[in-house]
Amino acid sequence: MTYAELLALARRFEGERLETVTGKGFTVGIYLDCPFFTPESSGYGQSDGRKAAERFLRRYNEIGSLRPGDYADVTRNASYYVVLVARA
C-alpha cells in the first residue's frame, strides 16, 4: 500500500464512525495531506505526522499484520491505521 492509497482510504471514511479492534469509536480526517484521528473518548484530533504514517506503511507492507502492537514503536496511532488498511 502506498501513502497515496492510505490518504484515499482516509478520505473515503472521513467523518464516518469507525471502531478499533477493541471496539473504541473514532473518526478519521485529513489535514495538510496527513491523516488525523479523533477518538470519541476525548473528542480531540491527534496525528503524529506523515513520517509516522510512512513508517507504519513500510512495516505494514513488510509484515501485513493487523495487530496494533506490531506497530507500537513506529506510531502511536497504530490502532487507527490498522482499521483503515483492513478496509482497503
What residues fall within each predicted segment?
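Intrinsically disordered, charged low-complexity linkers and terminal tails
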Residues: M1-A88
